[in-house]
A protein has these predicted regions:
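Acidic (Asp/Glu)-rich catalytic clusters
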Residues: 7-12, 43, 65-77, 104-110, ...
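Structural motif corresponding to the early beta-alpha repeats
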Residues: 71-94, 116-121
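CE4/NodB-like, metal-dependent polysaccharide N-deacetylase domain
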Residues: 95-116, 148-152, 183
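Active-site mouth loops of central-metabolism enzymes
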Residues: 20-32, 82-95, 131-132
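Beta/alpha (TIM)-barrel catalytic core signal, keyed to glycine-rich beta->alpha loops juxtaposed to Asp/Glu
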Residues: 120-260
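Short, acidic/polar
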Residues: 28-41, 91-106, 164-173
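Structural preference for beta-strand elements that scaffold enzyme active sites
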Residues: 5, 12-16, 47-48, 75-81, ...
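N-terminal binding-site loop/beta-alpha segment at the start of enzyme catalytic domains
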Residues: 1-76, 187
Length: 260
């Protein structure tokens, strides 16, 4: 398995196992199958597992907890996240801490390597238009809360999900202290699909470039654009759903792939 330096976590496998599948986000599967998938990925050399409470309402984290029962294999790195929104400043740390403690219980651990803000970061003047965490709140309250969790030894580092309003994401990457990593859209369509909840154009390549220039680790997400870049979608979607639209746009890609 090829490895790469990632976000201060040292060498990790180039491939990451995302928790959406084992959390049944993309369709129903059994707990036993999910546990077997996780163990098979680790046996194959994948040593970075990306999880979140929202992946199956905690199911992905429970799969991890069942698979390893608190005895995490040496060298295995894993993440979790918190969808924070826009609470009052004095509620930021309590909400992050509560989410983290609930994740610990499901994961059967007392520390995670990387803790992501799962909310979209938005400009302060966009709170009436977009759902997410205002950048001012992020700077004043979220970053200090993350740094406190690092100092307490409960997280190795903190990171952001870079699918918010692009300018706010870029400002966060370029600020100090900088995140250890950013999750960025990385697919052949440059499409965030249904995860895009703002009016501005998506610029994932600019976000990746800015992170690379700053030494911020990049975790590519939506590599097959939620199924739009695969041979078939595994679920029924309305014709105007972003993933269905992208699936039709990707028809030439599928034709070319079939020739190879």
């Amino acid at each position: 398995m090829e490895s790469r330096e990632f976000g201060g976590l040292g060498q990790v496998s180039a491939l990451t196992l995302g928790g959406g599948g084992i959390g049944q986000v993309w369709g129903a599967t059994s707990r036993d199958e999910s546990v077997a998938t996780l163990r098979a990925a680790v046996d194959a050399g994948i040593n970075l597992i990306d999880l979140a409470p929202s992946y199956g309402d905690g199911e992905a984290e429970r799969v991890f907890g069942q698979a390893f029962s608190g005895s995490v294999p040496t060298g295995l790195r894993f993440t979790t996240k918190c969808r924070l929104g826009s609470p009052a400043p004095d509620q930021v740390f309590p909400q992050l801490e509560q989410s983290l403690n609930e994740s610990f219980e499901r994961l059967k651990v007392d520390r995670v390597d990387l803790f992501f803000l799962h909310s979209q970061i938005i400009p302060d003047d966009s709170v009436d238009r977009y759902e997410g965490t205002p950048r001012g709140l992020f700077v004043a309250s979220v970053m200090p809360a993350f740094e406190r969790l690092v100092s307490d030894g409960r997280i190795g580092a903190w990171a952001i999900t870079g699918i918010g309003v692009p300018q706010a994401v870029l400002e966060t990457i370029k600020a100090e202290p900088q995140p250890a990593a950013v999750q960025a859209i990385a697919n052949l369509l440059d499409s965030p699909g249904a995860s895009k909840r703002y009016d501005e154009a998506a610029i994932p390549r600019d976000i990746i470039a800015a992170a690379s220039q700053r030494g911020v680790g990049v975790m590519g997400i939506r590599a097959v654009q939620a199924g739009a870049l695969t041979s078939s979608l595994d679920r029924e979607l309305p014709e105007d759903h972003p993933e269905a639209v992208d699936y039709r746009l990707a028809a030439p890609f599928r034709s070319r792939a079939a020739e190879l």
